[in-house]
Each structure stands twice: as C-alpha cells, then as structure tokens.
Amino acid sequence: MKKLITRSCEEIMTTVYKPIEFVIDGLLAQGLYILAGAPKVGKSWLVLDMCLSIAKGESVLGQKTLQGTALYLCLEDSYVRIQNRLYEITDVPTENLYFSVMSESIGNGLEEQIETFKIEHCGLKIVFIDTLQMVRSDTDSSYGSDYKDLSVLKALADKLEITVIVVHHTRKCKDSDPFNMISGSTGISGCVDGSLVLIENKRGSRNAKLFCVGRDIENAEISLHFDSDLKKWIVTDELSTSKTKDNIFLAALYVYLKRHISFTGTASELVSELKEVTQEQFYPNRVTRDLVQNGYTLRKYGIDFQYKRTRNGRLIILHYDRERDSSDIKNTSEVTVNKLIQKV
C-alpha cells in the first residue's frame, strides 16, 4: 500500500508557492474552464477576440492579458471561415496565434497533440477547444462520463500549467441559475476550475451577460454588447478587481524597505512601522498571509523574508537587496506608495 503523503497546516501556511497565473486578469486563471452559450449567440467571436488579445498582450473585456501563444481548435469550422472572421476583425496577421480544424478525441491522442504543441511552442498560455462534443469519443452524457472526460483535460491543464477553455452549449430551458443551463450533467461544472455562461438578454438583441464563477476568480456578471462593426463583445459596465488592498500593502512594504533595508520584529511591529510611509490601515493577523501569498512578487522587487520562532512568538525577518530588484523603479530616488500601487 502506498503511504499517504501529507503536509502540516503550518507548513502549508508558511510555504511560498508559485502564484496562480491569470491569462486574463480576474477572469481566467490556469486550469480548465467551460464557456457555454446558446448556438450562434456569439461564443466564437468572443473566443477569437480572446485569442487575438492574448497573442498580442492587449486587453480584452476591459481586463489585462498575459501575453503568450494561443491555440484555437476550431473543430466545427473550416480555414476559409476562420480567414473570413479574422479579416472582419483585423487585416494584420498576429504572431503566436495558431488554429486547427482537426484533432484527436479525449483519451485517443488529443492530450498528446496538445503536449507536443506545447513542446514546440513553449510560450503556450491558452488552448480553446470548440466544441466539447467534437473531442468526446462517445455520446454518453452521464455524470461519470462527463467527469471522466473533463478530468483528463483538467489534468492536462495542470500538468502543462496552461489555461484550457472548452466551448459548450446551453440547454434551451431557462433557469434562474445560469450555470444549471450548461448542457450535460453536473459532472461538467463539478470538474472544471471555472465556468463562463454567455446569455443574450433577448435573442438577437446583441446585448448579453457573461456569468462567471470559479475556484480562483470572484463571481461576476459582466454586461456586454456585441459591436457589429468591430465584431467584438464590448463591456458596458466595469469589472471590479479585489487586489487593491494587497497592492497597497506590497507598495508600502517596498517603500519602507528601500529606506531601511531590513526589518526584524512581530507582525504588529511591522504594521506600526509601515505607518511611516502610508496612512492605510493594515492588520497584524493578515500580514503573514500577505507576505506568503505574494512571495514571488516580493522576490521580483528584491525582498526576502523568513520567520523565526521564539519563546514569545514568531518574528518576521525582511531584507531588501537592491542588486536582486528586477523592477523598473529600483533606480528611482523618491518612490511613494501612491505612485507604486498600480505597478505592483
């Protein structure tokens, strides 16, 4: 019998893990997602806009993207149709965007095809599979079958550290919960890391809502309008982000350590010291979380930290190394918290 591998609560809470990468800020993280909507509602236009934006590193749906290679498996289309759609949006070819109209199915070679593509294009960030049914080997839509197929794609996304989005259809019947309208069993929504459901307010109105839910994203309802000239879904309200408080803490810490180089003390003492550079209120019981969860960002700014146990509690030890600061502001003499917030 294989021994169960465990980690203690303290080990997990004090380890700096590689942060989850968002390919579309606040909307799509690494992992497996479902994008569902009624036939001909405009899912393909949304996917194509996402592909082009990620490949070029441009904003989409009002959110920043992580630039990288995008692969779009248009399994219900032809290259002629893809060409026509591309020319509707742009007349300039985009690097780092690739298409295919044929692929193997799940469990019969699809995973290997995507893995091979990742080896050949190491900058791969996202794969769109349009549609789910085109890569399934059978028509069984039971919970077990749905979960089994999707779990293969989830394992692939986790292994390659990429985002995989599977385009799917919604049921015709209405439901007060839009995620219940995703065709198939609850095995689909149960397996994926997130679900996006595009629902038109009225058929043909070109006004819609994109409902979003996921493990690494906040629940959101984004109001959209389809611009027939641009062939894009345009956000008609703002998608708020929740990272502002974290950004203020990191900015304050950076400004403080640029002045003092080092700090050793308790969380309460650190909160007190940060009042030197900002009037923002921080809380000692959140300091450890903020340091651990933003460990990779701190290293980018040349900040190392560790904890030391004493009889009176745990000490936080911080040190700033200018030589290891890879930010573009390290040579700036006067850095303030307000100026730095948007950069962190």
Q: What residues fall within each predicted segment?
A:
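DNA transaction DNA-binding modules
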Residues: 224-344
